[in-house]
Each structure stands twice: as structure tokens, then as C-alpha cells.
Design a protein with these regions (language model features):
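Active-site loop ensemble at the mouth of alpha/beta enzyme cores that anchors a bound cofactor
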Residues: 1-3, 69, 161
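Short clusters of hydrophobic/aromatic residues that line enzyme substrate/ligand-binding pockets
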Residues: 3-4, 72, 79, 136
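Flexible loop residues that form catalytic
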Residues: 21, 37, 133
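Phosphate/ribose-recognition catalytic cores of enzymes acting on nucleotide-derived substrates
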Residues: 112-171
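Solvent-exposed alpha-helices and their adjacent loops that cap or buttress functional pockets
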Residues: 24-27, 51-53, 71, 142, ...
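Divalent-metal (Mg2+/Mn2+/Ca2+)-assisted nucleotide/phosphate chemistry catalytic cores
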Residues: 1-33
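Fold-independent oxyanion-binding glycine-rich loops
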Residues: 7, 36-37, 154
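Glycine-rich, Lys/Arg-enriched anion-binding loops that position phosphate/diphosphate groups
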Residues: 38-126, 131, 171
Length: 171
């Protein structure tokens, strides 16, 4: 895929698919568990399983969050204490945006989320895409898909650290 993570990290999902398909061929699992934090990866792996024709149930595991709402990630250890506090705004803003889906169209909600996060010193949105949760194709209206997900990557801090998260709007 060449959208979101695939566009920012060329070849990344080719590598993911190569490693995961080899693992699946060796292990032959009936179920495989993947964390929802990287929503795009789940969608890619579901398509991979269909493509290679294996009967594997892909189980989506909810994001584990710290008490502030920050999605758990090994990258969080690179954040300073004040940067962790700043980063917790990502999920807060995403969560608040759910309440706006009946008031704002997709484009306006997108802009509001990006502008609100970018207005916080120490945060910079790399991308925020509102997509069909299965196909990863952009949605332009809330009724374009029964399954709508917002996928975001934000740089946090002086270093800066790249953080990913997502929010389910429908489905």
C-alpha cells in the first residue's frame, strides 16, 4: 500500500507481508492477533490472508493505553515526562472528535483535529486520514462506509518521536 504509513515508509508493508506470510506458512495458525494501534497494518494483513488463501482469523486486539490515554508503544520510553503529557492530547482530541461526527462533515472534522493537535506546542501532525476501515480508501462523507476509522501519526517533542494512533468513528 502507498497510503499513510506505506507512503511515508516505502517498502514497509512489503516487508511486513513477506515476514508475516512466511510465519503463517510455517506456523499454520487458526488465529493471529494484531494490535489495533497500527490499524493500517491490520487491514493489510487481512488482505494478505485473503490473497494467500489461508484460513486464518485475524483478531483485532484493542489498544492498550496508559492512564492518560496515550497508546502504549516502545517509542513512549523515548519521550520525556512533559512530552508524554503533551502526547496524551492526541487521544483526547481524537476521542472528542467522535462527538462531532453528527455536526461536522468529514473534511471539516479532519481539519479540526489536525488544527487542534498542531496548535499544541510540541505536537505536529504528519498525517490524519479518515478512511474505510477495511479498504483504507478515504471517505468523503460519513455514509460512504459502514466502517470508518481515523488514522493519525503525530510527531511529539524536540527529538521528535513519531507516534501512531487511531479512532473508530463507525463500525
Amino acid at each position: 500500500t502507498t497510503v499513510m504509513e506505506g507512503g511515508k515508509r516505502p517498502g514497509h508493508f512489503n516487508g511486513v507481508c513477506q515476514v508475516v506470510s512466511r510465519l503463517f506458512y510455517i506456523v499454520r495458525p487458526s488465529n493471529a492477533y494484531f494490535g489495533e494501534k497500527d490499524w493500517q497494518q491490520i487491514a493489510v494483513i487481512k488482505r494478505l490472508v485473503d490473497y494467500i488463501g489461508m484460513d486464518i482469523q485475524i483478531v483485532e486486539c484493542p489498544i492498550v493505553r496508559d492512564k492518560s490515554g496515550l497508546a502504549m508503544s516502545s517509542r513512549n520510553s523515548l519521550l520525556k515526562k512533559n512530552e508524554r503529557e503533551i502526547a496524551s492530547n492526541i487521544y483526547r482530541i481524537l476521542k472528542e472528535s467522535i462527538e462531532l461526527t453528527d455536526k461536522l462533515n468529514v473534511s471539516d472534522l479532519h481539519d479540526k483535529v489536525v488544527n487542534e493537535i498542531n496548535s499544541i506546542e510540541g505536537l505536529k501532525v504528519e498525517y490524519f486520514e479518515i478512511v474505510d476501515g477495511n479498504t483504507l480508501l478515504p471517505v468523503h462523507q460519513w455514509n460512504d462506509s459502514p466502517y470508518v476509522v481515523g488514522c493519525i501519526t503525530v510527531y511529539c517533542g524536540q527529538t521528535p518521536i513519531r507516534l501512531i494512533d487511531h479512532i473508530k468513528y463507525k463500525g
